């Protein structure tokens, strides 16, 4: 988001920058996209010994302490958009705004129930989350619907076993 502001500021000498899809308004004045470099899915991890059915998972994520990234981060902006699409407005006090590294430690220690993060599979943060025992990766069964409603979202599918073959994680192909 900072790069969007810098690109739009006529006093700033920056002429090009990397910006996460969706971080700028659809027609941001003075900014032209040159394409996408990679996919950065929205990963939501939640505390549970086993994967939960969609309704239980939604209840857990929406009624407990969830980190949605710092204000003006790409994760925060995307989470706000997804909450709005689901009719969730008003009191969002259960949604926390910690930096990713701090949120991961809080999730590991049990001080958070869920962490959502926009990043690549290879990122150190996603790799840390994948190695924490007792966490489940949330699927987005309606990923295709989100992708149709928000131009910056592209659906990706994590194939069965792609994150960890020996433990077959995820146990089914997971839309994200």
Residue ranges and their predicted role:
Residues 31-34, 81-83, 129-131:
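Short, glycine/charged-enriched secondary-structure capping and boundary segments
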Residues 14, 35-38, 52-53, 85-88, ...:
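Short, low-complexity, polar/charged sequence segments that are solvent-exposed and flexible
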């Amino acid at each position: 988001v900072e790069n969007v502001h810098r690109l739009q500021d006529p006093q700033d000498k920056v002429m090009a920058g990397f910006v996460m899809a969706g971080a700028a308004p659809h027609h941001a004045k003075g900014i032209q996209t040159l394409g996408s470099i990679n996919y950065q899915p929205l990963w939501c991890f939640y505390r549970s010994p086993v994967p939960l059915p969609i309704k239980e998972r939604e209840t857990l994520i929406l009624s407990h302490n969830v980190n949605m990234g710092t204000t003006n981060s790409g994760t925060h902006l995307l989470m706000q958009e997804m909450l709005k699409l689901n009719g969730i407005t008003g009191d969002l006090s259960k949604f926390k705004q910690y930096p990713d590294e701090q949120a991961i430690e809080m999730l590991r220690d049990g001080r958070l129930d869920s962490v959502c993060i926009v990043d690549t599979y290879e990122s150190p943060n996603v790799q840390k989350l994948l190695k924490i025992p007792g966490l489940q990766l949330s699927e987005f069964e309606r990923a295709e619907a989100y992708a149709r409603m928000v131009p910056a979202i592209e659906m990706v599918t994590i194939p069965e076993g792609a994150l960890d073959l020996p433990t077959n994680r995820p146990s089914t192909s997971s839309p994200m």
